[in-house]
Curated annotation (Swiss-Prot):
Keywords: Carbohydrate metabolism, Galactose metabolism, Isomerase, NAD. Its cofactor is NAD(+). Its EC number is 5.1.3.2. One of its GO terms (cellular component) is cytosol. The gene is UGE-4. Catalyzes the interconversion between UDP-glucose and UDP-galactose. This is UDP-glucose 4-epimerase 4. It comes from Oryza sativa subsp. japonica (Rice). GO terms for molecular function: UDP-glucose 4-epimerase activity.
């Protein structure tokens, strides 16, 4: 993709507030984080190829941000395009970077490993090279609980062994190792690696949410698509686990809580020289697949027909986080419960049954909600 093409969302205002580059800022977690950054007073520049995300997400962020949308701009650029990225860094002095850009479908990573190493590892290397060349040495990196593989015990702390099971998880671990090596070579760097568990939910307005291209790779969008009639049933992979109801247990976290975690991480970066450190972002609670389905049925009033399938190879029985380190050092804690996650997911789904491609999307484009 040609780099450096600027899509004007709103004219960025000059000011003394800190300026943050958000790669992948049109994506699911990225767009929610951009909105929270604007609300917190940051100037935000989004760099996104728009290959697996929608420009409409950024336009809706601008609408939701109101007056603060003047502090938002979007560059349509692929982070693997070094020349395009150089132009972005030459146009603005960044105080820090929040790096979301990448591919995230576990199944696809098994089928197309080179594609994942190219986007998630080579792309990160190019970003780090350009950051270093421009003297920007503060980074919040979007990692994943996938770096842990299938831990034998939960809650999972940051000290657990890093044994990812698939190419996606390995790309995240390699990018983490690169960040650690950079810090050891140059202590001016401050890097926070955020390992997310299972992000779900949507902005309470119902105008920002997850818009997966093709087949979703996690539970909640599948539940959502069944509820709005796009799929006939939900397949549960395994109901014979040693859990309370036989289905797998995961740590689901509201995307707004996750976005707030990024703001807290950025503040930590600006406060002190942190080195290179990893933090889990989760609720610290495990919820089963059936509990999610029941909560979604309750808030939506829709029945979710279930099909029981075999276990998927490599799926952990129980995986939930200890987020004690982030709570202690960031003063951050997830606030939303499962019912609120499902409520906001359903609000988004019912307003946007086909994601950002919904027929009335254009009407919602330029208005505050």
């Amino acid at each position: 993709m040609a780099g450096g093409e600027v899509v004007a969302v709103a004219a960025a205002a000059a000011g003394t507030s800190r300026t943050v580059l958000v790669t992948g800022g049109a994506g699911y977690i990225g767009s929610h984080t951009v909105l929270q950054l604007l609300a917190a007073g940051f100037r935000v520049v989004v760099a996104d190829s728009l290959g697996n995300s929608s420009e409409l997400a950024v336009r809706r962020v601008a609408a939701l941000a109101g007056d603060k949308a003047r502090n938002l701009s979007l560059h349509k650029v692929d982070i693997r395009d070094k020349g395009g990225l150089e132009k972005v860094f030459s146009s603005t002095r960044f105080d820090a970077v929040v790096h979301f850009a990448g591919l995230k479908a576990v199944g696809e990573s098994v089928q197309k490993p080179l594609l994942y190493y190219d986007h998630n590892v080579a792309g990160t290397i190019i970003l780090l090279e350009v950051m270093a060349a421009h003297g920007c040495k503060k980074l919040v990196f979007s990692s994943s609980a996938a770096v842990y593989g299938s831990p034998k015990n939960s809650p999972c702390t940051e000290e657990f062994p890093l044994t990812p099971h698939n190419p996606y998880g390995r790309t995240k671990l390699i990018a983490e190792e690169i960040c650690r090596d950079i810090y050891h070579s140059d202590s001016e760097w401050s890097i926070i690696l955020l390992r997310y568990f299972n992000p779900v939910g949507a902005h309470p307005s119902g105008y920002l949410g997850e818009d997966p291209c093709g087949i979703p790779n996690n539970l909640m969008p599948f539940v959502q698509q069944v509820a709005v009639g796009r799929r006939p049933s939900l397949t549960i992979f395994g109901n014979d686990y040693a859990t309370k109801d036989g289905t797998g247990v995961r740590d689901y976290i509201h995307v707004v809580d996750l976005a707030e975690g990024h703001i807290a991480a950025l503040r930590k970066l600006f406060e002190s020289s942190i080195g290179c450190q990893a933090y889990n972002l989760g609720t610290g609670k495990g919820t089963s697949v059936l509990e999610i389905v029941n909560a979604f049925e309750k808030v939506s009033g829709k029945k979710i027909p279930l099909v029981i399938g075999p276990r998927r190879p490599g799926d952990a029985e129980i995986l939930f986080s200890s987020a004690a380190k982030a709570e202690r050092e960031f003063k951050w804690k997830a606030k939303y419960g499962i019912e609120e996650m499902c409520r906001d997911q359903w609000n988004w789904a019912s307003k946007n049954p086909f994601g950002y491609a919904s027929p009335d999307s254009t009407k919602q484009n330029g208005h505050s909600h």
